[in-house]
Amino acid sequence: ALQGLREALQRNPTNKNLKEALDIAPEDHSSAYLSYYNLAKSGFEEPMTTHSDHYNSNYGYSIAAYSKGEVFMEQLGYIVGADTRDKILLEYYKQWRFKHPNANDFIRVAEDVSGIQLDWYKEYWVNTIKTIDYKIDSLWEENGVSKIRLKRIGHIPMPIDLQLTFKDGSTEMFYVPLNLMFGAKPNENN
């Protein structure tokens, strides 16, 4: 059950720190997202909590253990903010190095550091095969004010960062927190 998170924890800080030390561009996670997307569409996905010996296919296991774990960690940065995610990883290492943590221990550290409730994220991402999918449902103007309606298509709720681009080329970011979080990530647009 912990294999995917374990792989992500081992990979994320190591690659980030190495790339900073060597002055290399940040890691592109697109291959992990693509692998996960293909697995989700394939019908072979199983919850990450499935014991490694009990997966119905090697394909499902390998993507869950590596790519889906990497996506979990990258999305955690989206939920709590990338800087906060990095602080979570450092604190988790400090508290749990040379010990035997479980997935709940990681989430407890993440909640303590971020001040955000994260059980919902772990439950959906690790224990189910539900997906995240939103779309712009409609746009309209009301009393000179533009309105946007978003629609959740997938079954995993997420906070939303929505960037609007105006006719003059300027942009503005809007953040819609999720009520399950009982908090919000720091403003990352400064």
Tell what function each PLM region has.
Residues 1-153, 157:
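Hydrophobic alpha-helical and helix-loop surface patches within well-folded domains
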